[in-house]
Amino acid sequence: GDVYKRQAQIIIWQEHISLIKSQRLNEMKEKRITIGDKTLKFDFLIYGEKPKSGRSLYISMHGGGGAPPQVNDGQWKNQMRLYKPNEGIYLCPRAPTDTWNLWHQSHIDPLFDRLIENMIIFEEVDPDKVYLMGYSAGGDGVYQLAPRMCDRFAAAAMMAGHPNETSPQGLRNLPFALQVGENDKSYRRNKIALSCVARSLQNFRKMTLKAIHTS
Protein backbone atom coordinates (compact mmCIF):
# COMPACT_ATOMS: atom_id res chain seq x y z
CA GLY A 1 0.00 0.00 0.00
CA ASP A 2 0.97 3.63 0.44
CA VAL A 3 3.16 2.86 3.47
CA TYR A 4 5.38 0.47 1.51
CA LYS A 5 5.51 2.90 -1.42
CA ARG A 6 6.67 5.66 0.91
CA GLN A 7 9.29 3.40 2.49
CA ALA A 8 10.60 2.46 -0.96
CA GLN A 9 10.83 6.14 -1.92
CA ILE A 10 12.84 6.90 1.22
CA ILE A 11 15.24 4.01 0.57
CA ILE A 12 15.77 5.04 -3.07
CA TRP A 13 16.34 8.67 -2.06
CA GLN A 14 18.84 7.73 0.65
CA GLU A 15 20.77 5.57 -1.83
CA HIS A 16 20.77 8.45 -4.30
CA ILE A 17 22.11 10.81 -1.62
CA SER A 18 24.94 8.39 -0.82
CA LEU A 19 25.83 8.07 -4.51
CA ILE A 20 25.84 11.83 -5.14
CA LYS A 21 27.90 12.53 -2.01
CA SER A 22 30.53 10.01 -3.07
CA GLN A 23 30.68 11.29 -6.66
CA ARG A 24 30.48 15.05 -6.10
CA LEU A 25 32.24 15.73 -2.80
CA ASN A 26 35.29 17.26 -4.47
CA GLU A 27 33.31 19.64 -6.67
CA MET A 28 31.50 20.95 -3.60
CA LYS A 29 34.77 21.37 -1.69
CA GLU A 30 36.31 23.19 -4.66
CA LYS A 31 33.08 25.10 -5.37
CA ARG A 32 33.20 24.44 -9.08
CA ILE A 33 31.09 22.22 -11.34
CA THR A 34 32.31 21.05 -14.74
CA ILE A 35 30.12 19.55 -17.45
CA GLY A 36 31.80 19.03 -20.80
CA ASP A 37 34.08 21.99 -21.52
CA LYS A 38 32.24 24.47 -19.26
CA THR A 39 32.99 25.14 -15.58
CA LEU A 40 30.69 26.97 -13.18
CA LYS A 41 32.44 28.40 -10.12
CA PHE A 42 30.33 29.50 -7.16
CA ASP A 43 30.49 30.79 -3.62
CA PHE A 44 27.85 31.09 -0.93
CA LEU A 45 27.05 32.37 2.55
CA ILE A 46 24.61 30.83 5.03
CA TYR A 47 22.25 33.00 7.08
CA GLY A 48 19.93 32.22 9.99
CA GLU A 49 18.76 28.97 11.51
CA LYS A 50 17.85 26.04 9.28
CA PRO A 51 14.08 25.38 9.21
CA LYS A 52 12.87 21.80 9.67
CA SER A 53 11.97 21.59 5.97
CA GLY A 54 15.44 22.75 4.91
CA ARG A 55 17.14 26.00 4.00
CA SER A 56 16.07 28.45 1.32
CA LEU A 57 18.46 28.89 -1.62
CA TYR A 58 18.90 32.22 -3.38
CA ILE A 59 20.86 31.98 -6.65
CA SER A 60 22.07 35.47 -7.53
CA MET A 61 23.60 36.08 -10.98
CA HIS A 62 26.15 38.84 -11.51
CA GLY A 63 26.24 41.46 -14.25
CA GLY A 64 28.95 42.20 -16.79
CA GLY A 65 29.32 40.09 -19.91
CA GLY A 66 31.10 40.98 -23.12
CA ALA A 67 34.12 42.06 -21.08
CA PRO A 68 37.55 40.75 -20.00
CA PRO A 69 37.55 38.03 -17.29
CA GLN A 70 38.79 40.41 -14.59
CA VAL A 71 35.77 42.66 -15.12
CA ASN A 72 33.32 39.79 -14.75
CA ASP A 73 35.28 38.45 -11.77
CA GLY A 74 34.79 41.87 -10.15
CA GLN A 75 31.07 41.75 -10.89
CA TRP A 76 30.88 38.28 -9.32
CA LYS A 77 32.64 39.41 -6.13
CA ASN A 78 30.42 42.49 -5.94
CA GLN A 79 27.30 40.32 -6.24
CA MET A 80 28.28 38.49 -3.05
CA ARG A 81 27.88 41.75 -1.10
CA LEU A 82 24.45 42.77 -2.38
CA TYR A 83 22.00 40.78 -0.26
CA LYS A 84 21.79 39.28 3.23
CA PRO A 85 18.57 37.27 3.67
CA ASN A 86 17.31 36.59 7.19
CA GLU A 87 17.37 32.87 6.45
CA GLY A 88 18.85 30.75 3.74
CA ILE A 89 21.86 30.28 1.51
CA TYR A 90 22.87 33.22 -0.65
CA LEU A 91 24.80 31.75 -3.58
CA CYS A 92 26.54 33.62 -6.39
CA PRO A 93 27.74 31.60 -9.38
CA ARG A 94 30.47 32.88 -11.68
CA ALA A 95 29.38 32.57 -15.32
CA PRO A 96 31.40 29.97 -17.28
CA THR A 97 32.07 32.43 -20.13
CA ASP A 98 32.68 36.15 -20.57
CA THR A 99 30.33 36.62 -23.52
CA TRP A 100 27.48 39.16 -23.63
CA ASN A 101 24.94 36.34 -23.17
CA LEU A 102 26.91 34.68 -20.39
CA TRP A 103 23.84 33.53 -18.40
CA HIS A 104 21.43 32.24 -21.01
CA GLN A 105 23.45 29.92 -23.20
CA SER A 106 22.35 26.27 -23.29
CA HIS A 107 25.14 24.98 -21.03
CA ILE A 108 23.73 26.94 -18.07
CA ASP A 109 20.65 24.70 -17.66
CA PRO A 110 22.47 21.42 -16.83
CA LEU A 111 25.02 23.28 -14.69
CA PHE A 112 22.25 24.90 -12.63
CA ASP A 113 20.37 21.59 -12.39
CA ARG A 114 23.47 19.97 -10.92
CA LEU A 115 24.18 22.94 -8.64
CA ILE A 116 20.65 22.88 -7.21
CA GLU A 117 20.76 19.11 -6.67
CA ASN A 118 24.13 19.42 -4.93
CA MET A 119 22.84 22.15 -2.62
CA ILE A 120 19.78 20.06 -1.72
CA ILE A 121 21.95 17.06 -0.83
CA PHE A 122 25.05 18.66 0.70
CA GLU A 123 23.53 21.76 2.36
CA GLU A 124 19.99 20.52 3.12
CA VAL A 125 18.21 23.03 0.89
CA ASP A 126 14.43 22.75 0.64
CA PRO A 127 13.75 22.02 -3.07
CA ASP A 128 10.51 24.02 -2.79
CA LYS A 129 12.41 27.15 -1.72
CA VAL A 130 14.91 27.76 -4.52
CA TYR A 131 14.87 31.33 -5.84
CA LEU A 132 16.55 32.94 -8.86
CA MET A 133 17.64 36.56 -9.18
CA GLY A 134 20.07 38.67 -11.17
CA TYR A 135 20.78 42.19 -12.35
CA SER A 136 22.01 43.68 -15.63
CA ALA A 137 23.44 40.71 -17.58
CA GLY A 138 22.24 38.57 -14.67
CA GLY A 139 18.78 40.04 -15.23
CA ASP A 140 19.02 38.95 -18.87
CA GLY A 141 19.63 35.46 -17.52
CA VAL A 142 16.57 35.57 -15.25
CA TYR A 143 14.38 36.58 -18.21
CA GLN A 144 15.68 33.50 -20.06
CA LEU A 145 16.19 30.85 -17.38
CA ALA A 146 13.03 31.37 -15.33
CA PRO A 147 10.69 30.27 -18.17
CA ARG A 148 13.08 27.50 -19.26
CA MET A 149 13.62 26.07 -15.77
CA CYS A 150 10.35 27.14 -14.14
CA ASP A 151 9.92 23.78 -12.38
CA ARG A 152 13.14 24.38 -10.42
CA PHE A 153 12.22 27.72 -8.82
CA ALA A 154 9.75 29.00 -6.23
CA ALA A 155 10.04 32.55 -7.62
CA ALA A 156 12.33 34.68 -9.77
CA ALA A 157 13.34 38.36 -9.74
CA MET A 158 14.80 40.28 -12.69
CA MET A 159 16.64 43.57 -12.13
CA ALA A 160 17.70 45.90 -14.98
CA GLY A 161 17.96 43.24 -17.65
CA HIS A 162 16.82 42.67 -21.22
CA PRO A 163 14.64 39.71 -22.34
CA ASN A 164 16.13 39.41 -25.83
CA GLU A 165 14.25 36.64 -27.68
CA THR A 166 12.74 34.89 -24.64
CA SER A 167 9.08 33.91 -24.27
CA PRO A 168 7.20 34.42 -20.97
CA GLN A 169 4.91 31.41 -21.43
CA GLY A 170 6.77 29.32 -18.84
CA LEU A 171 5.98 31.90 -16.14
CA ARG A 172 2.28 31.15 -15.74
CA ASN A 173 2.76 29.37 -12.40
CA LEU A 174 5.99 31.07 -11.32
CA PRO A 175 5.96 34.31 -9.30
CA PHE A 176 8.14 36.70 -11.31
CA ALA A 177 9.25 40.23 -10.40
CA LEU A 178 10.54 42.86 -12.83
CA GLN A 179 12.53 45.76 -11.40
CA VAL A 180 13.61 48.34 -13.96
CA GLY A 181 14.16 52.05 -13.35
CA GLU A 182 11.77 54.46 -15.05
CA ASN A 183 14.74 56.23 -16.64
CA ASP A 184 16.80 53.12 -17.40
CA LYS A 185 16.98 53.78 -21.14
CA SER A 186 20.05 51.65 -21.90
CA TYR A 187 19.04 49.09 -24.54
CA ARG A 188 15.47 50.44 -24.05
CA ARG A 189 15.19 48.29 -20.92
CA ASN A 190 12.45 50.45 -19.35
CA LYS A 191 10.11 50.29 -22.36
CA ILE A 192 10.87 46.64 -23.07
CA ALA A 193 10.06 45.69 -19.46
CA LEU A 194 6.61 47.30 -19.83
CA SER A 195 6.11 45.50 -23.13
CA CYS A 196 7.13 42.19 -21.54
CA VAL A 197 4.60 42.65 -18.73
CA ALA A 198 1.83 43.51 -21.20
CA ARG A 199 2.66 40.50 -23.36
CA SER A 200 2.73 38.22 -20.32
CA LEU A 201 -0.70 39.42 -19.18
CA GLN A 202 -2.09 38.95 -22.67
CA ASN A 203 -0.75 35.38 -22.87
CA PHE A 204 -2.07 34.63 -19.38
CA ARG A 205 -5.58 35.80 -20.33
CA LYS A 206 -5.51 33.67 -23.49
CA MET A 207 -4.41 30.55 -21.60
CA THR A 208 -6.97 31.17 -18.84
CA LEU A 209 -9.83 31.59 -21.30
CA LYS A 210 -8.73 28.46 -23.17
CA ALA A 211 -8.66 26.49 -19.91
CA ILE A 212 -12.16 27.72 -19.01
CA HIS A 213 -13.60 26.79 -22.40
CA THR A 214 -12.02 23.32 -22.43
CA SER A 215 -12.87 22.40 -18.83
What are the language-model segments listed below?
Residues 49-53, 100-137, 148-152:
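Gly/Ser-rich "nucleophile elbow"/oxyanion-hole loop immediately N-terminal to the catalytic nucleophile
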Residues 55-56, 88, 129, 154, ...:
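Alpha/beta-hydrolase fold active-site loops
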Residues 36-49, 57:
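A short loop-to-beta-strand scaffold at the N-terminal edge of the catalytic core in hydrolase folds
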Residues 3-4:
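Short, small-residue-biased leader/transition segments that mark boundaries at the very start
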Residues 177-180:
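Short beta-strand/loop motif that positions the catalytic acidic residue
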Residues 185, 191-215:
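C-terminal catalytic histidine-bearing segment of alpha/beta-hydrolase fold enzymes
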Residues 55-121:
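Active-site machinery of serine-nucleophile hydrolases
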Residues 128-172:
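Primarily recognizes the serine-hydrolase "nucleophile elbow" in alpha/beta-hydrolase
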